[in-house]
Amino acid sequence: MWLQLGLPSLSLSPTPTVGRSLCLILWFLSLVLRASTQAPAPTVNTHFGKLRGARVPLPSEILGPVDQYLGVPYAAPPIGEKRFLPPEPPPSWSGIRNATHFPPVCPQNIHTAVPEVMLPVWFTANLDIVATYIQEPNEDCLYLNVYVPTEDVKRISKECARKPNKKICRKGGSGAKKQGEDLADNDGDEDEDIRDSGAKPVMVYIHGGSYMEGTGNMIDGSVLASYGNVIVITLNYRVGVLGFLSTGDQAAKGNYGLLDQIQALRWVSENIAFFGGDPRRITVFGSGIGASCVSLLTLSHHSEGLFQRAIIQSGSALSSWAVNYQPVKYTSLLADKVGCNVLDTVDMVDCLRQKSAKELVEQDIQPARYHVAFGPVIDGDVIPDDPEILMEQGEFLNYDIMLGVNQGEGLKFVEGVVDPEDGVSGTDFDYSVSNFVDNLYGYPEGKDTLRETIKFMYTDWADRDNPETRRKTLVALFTDHQWVEPSVVTADLHARYGSPTYFYAFYHHCQSLMKPAWSDAAHGDEVPYVFGVPMVGPTDLFPCNFSKNDVMLSAVVMTYWTNFAKTGDPNKPVPQDTKFIHTKANRFEEVAWSKYNPRDQLYLHIGLKPRVRDHYRATKVAFWKHLVPHLYNLHDMFHYTSTTTKVPPPDTTHSSHITRRPNGKTWSTKRPAISPAYSNENAPGSWNGDQDAGPLLVENPRDYSTELSVTIAVGASLLFLNVLAFAALYYRKDKRRQEPLRQPSPQRGTGAPELGTAPEEELAALQLGPTHHECEAGPPHDTLRLTALPDYTLTLRRSPDDIPLMTPNTITMIPNSLVGLQTLHPYNTFAAGFNSTGLPNSHSTTRV
């Protein structure tokens, strides 16, 4: 290459001039100088053979070079008969393996309709760029990339010039610093990096996507490794059909993508010491779907002992898209498309193994909105039970966990109904909520109540007619349900027994054309700051106009993340110090990130004005956690008829409503039965059973009579039940007080006449045994009926095959009636006093 690029053009003249001779001499000198200054290629030994990497300088004077080992195999190729099977250890090799090029990515297809609602903004806005990272996919794709920091002479020199009294400078200048020492102002023992000259912490990144696409090759871990003095690892794992197909039985159990991640962690645990890493300080982190994978890994016994800490960015195992509860349905659809739909699942899987990977991944199988077609499944092994049950049992308490969300995660959920200039109309708002309820909760009897209550909660009544306000609240609705509530519940369950937990809310994003100007920090906006992209400038995937504030915030985030990987505490050992960017101190130097606990719920607001706050969106979290599950089952608990709003009979034939997606695709949903806005039969918009179904929603302003009637009915019902319960208890107590007066005296030996005067009803009440109920059922025609005491049995999410399942958030203790309803702990779905570390009984759950 040098001969092609650096050799000057020489003339064939027999008598070269002095100038040409001088150029030739200078060229040879430059070659010698380049060869003498070029660092030798790093090599490292592993249990499977030797690797040769490359030392790569970074385009920043504060960042030292990084040794990169790309395309390191961590498992045997899952090809042929090994397709749809757990991974196996990689084969050994002889000689030195060249690890200087990215490996092939796992087979995937981003040219069909991708589920944009689950993908980060920087991914969906740059699909053409993303396509360049997934060219020439191959089933032989189970490789990882290792980024190892080296000595940073330039950064040390700059730090010593700025602070000559630092220990590393007093010991003999920058040249005396050992590889691995941090540049923090560690004059005090409390600021010392506990492993300065020893083994480095390891951070393993699980890429996101939608379980259908993605690769670790898209994320460069060099800046994070160099700045944070940690070893960063990215990896590929099987995605889509090849990674998560499941028949629901032993023929194809599924979860191969998760098993790939576990095998990668096993390889790291056994080999990272050769790279200078500490196998006792391995942190797994990810964003979006990657965060859901991390959350699931903390619940699996297969990953025990393979890592110690987890950073969960904008995701949770409790999100609706984290687990696939209908794997057989989508496997059958795939088998139909490729001609493998046979009754015997073993034969079906054998047939699918004979198909090419390209044929399988190119099949366009669209899941229900807010769900996944191919993803992790509850198989009784890798994921032994429902994630919320596992969290209740404390399966993840041995890990230190840091987790959080971005301010406007739900941007992609509303982009299709948003006018960039005018906001969201009232009709679009109503339709979005109705579609949300249909896709997540199906068509329960109490769907109208649930829908109207959600709209009530997410209407800004002080500015209800402002389209921009509707747009903001609609983004908040999806953000709260899909990200905030699952993350807060995860944090509560992890922290309630004292396990180290840290929570954050990310409120900053770079300026770019990838999303609207009105948007907040959207899904995936924290990723460039975690990996230090602002320090090296815009990239093809992150074409932002980074400012000094962006560089400062990226340095802050990397310090927090790497501190947590080092000690389990984001505040130490390295203090926040970005004076090499700004001459004045940043606000983070005065902020101490407090631990999270279920009572105070302290979290760090990460933005240009950082602060520690408490109870992040507590009202909305309580709404989704406690009220919505009861509203969903409202029809089963009691029946009532609204007296203020005319409700049409339920529409048993749901017509199909086609909606254009932002990317040009269409998706079909069933039209919900909408209550009319006005009860006047003569009004233009009134409902008429003889008329054909009109538009989905009326354009006229609504008077919210339905919401008012629902609120009044629910409140009155609860009040009435409380009065009945109180009256029953008072009646029983009064009877017990009067019972001694009615019993015969021993001296008199009589008393039968007194008892005989009591009515038969009172006599029966006095003779009730302890197994009877205090309140018997009323006449069958009563609107409200008091039944037996509630049976709090853990109800899993189940649904018919033709409607999507409920979200993981709807696992709740559902009473059979409202009588005797026990008070639930604010952070627990079990009744107060129940030991949540174990299930209520061995038969209280049913595997979906």
Swiss-Prot record:
Disulfide bond positions: 106-141, 340-351, 510-544
Glycosylation: residue positions: 98, 545
Keyword Transmembrane helix in annotation: yes
Residues where Phosphoserine is found: 745
InterPro entries on file: AB_hydrolase_fold, CarbesteraseB, Carboxylesterase_B_CS, Neuroligin/BSAL, Nlgn
Compartment(s) of residence: Cell membrane; Synapse
Membrane topology annotation: Single-pass type I membrane protein
Composition bias, Polar residues: 645-656, 677-689
Post-translational modification: The N-terminus is blocked.
A single GO BP: presynaptic membrane assembly
Positions in the Cytoplasmic compartment: 731-848
Regions that span the bilayer: 710-730
Function as written in the Swiss-Prot or TrEMBL entry: Cell surface protein involved in cell-cell-interactions via its interactions with neurexin family members. Plays a role in synapse function and synaptic signal transmission, and probably mediates its effects by recruiting and clustering other synaptic proteins. May promote the initial formation of synapses, but is not essential for this. May also play a role in glia-glia or glia-neuron interactions in the developing peripheral nervous system.
UniProt name for this protein: Neuroligin-3
